[in-house]
Amino acid sequence: MASGKFITFEGIDGAGKTTHLAWFCERLQGRLAAAGRQVVVTREPGGTQLGEKLREILLNQPMDLETEALLMFAARREHLALVIEPALARGDWVVSDRFTDATFAYQGGGRGLPRDKLETLERWVQGGFQPDLTVLFDVAPQVASERRGAARMPDKFESESDAFFSRTRAEYLRRAEEAPHRFAIVDATRSIPEIRQQLERVLAAL
């Protein structure tokens, strides 16, 4: 653990990733404390003052598909410049609730934006930068829908159909298949204790 690492949590809405993020980060911080390193917890869209303003717009206002993707990457560039890159340079670890895989899954898989357009934006905004580890919480859209139904007032993405989330999930799994060295897939249909057992194995491998 000599240098900072970047970890992302991904999954469709209702997969339960946010439920486990604080627990995971607390466990990770316990391992890093002896080395004097911190865990920076953040999210996308968001993580910066500008990013949080864009988050409010992106999650609640209808807009053109390409506009949506551009705003996602604009928020990401600010996030990288102000939060992620400085933290990693300090040797800290960063754990983000979503990153670029979400854009490929939601705007690409879910909304149907051509992959080559997203790849162009990814190269421009990130260069070759990718997470060291992506923890993908995988769950069937029907299960996720039942979980979301008991939640607060849904945003525009949470209100999407099971068909939308089927496409989103398929894109997540495709990306995981293309980069198995980067992804750890968690069976998010399991109980909370069982999911945390899976996450313990992820932590042990870091």
Curated annotation (Swiss-Prot):
Keywords: ATP-binding, Kinase, Nucleotide biosynthesis, Nucleotide-binding, Transferase. ATP binds at G11, I12, D13, G14, A15, G16, K17, T18. GO terms for biological process: dTDP biosynthetic process; dTTP biosynthetic process; dUDP biosynthetic process. It catalyses: dTMP + ATP = dTDP + ADP. It comes from the Bacteria. GO terms for cellular component: cytosol. InterPro entries: P-loop_NTPase, Thymidylate_kin-like_dom, Thymidylate_kinase. Its EC number is 2.7.4.9. One of its GO terms (molecular function) is dTMP kinase activity. Signal peptide: none annotated. Phosphorylation of dTMP to form dTDP in both de novo and salvage pathways of dTTP synthesis. Belongs to the thymidylate kinase family. This is Thymidylate kinase. The gene is tmk.
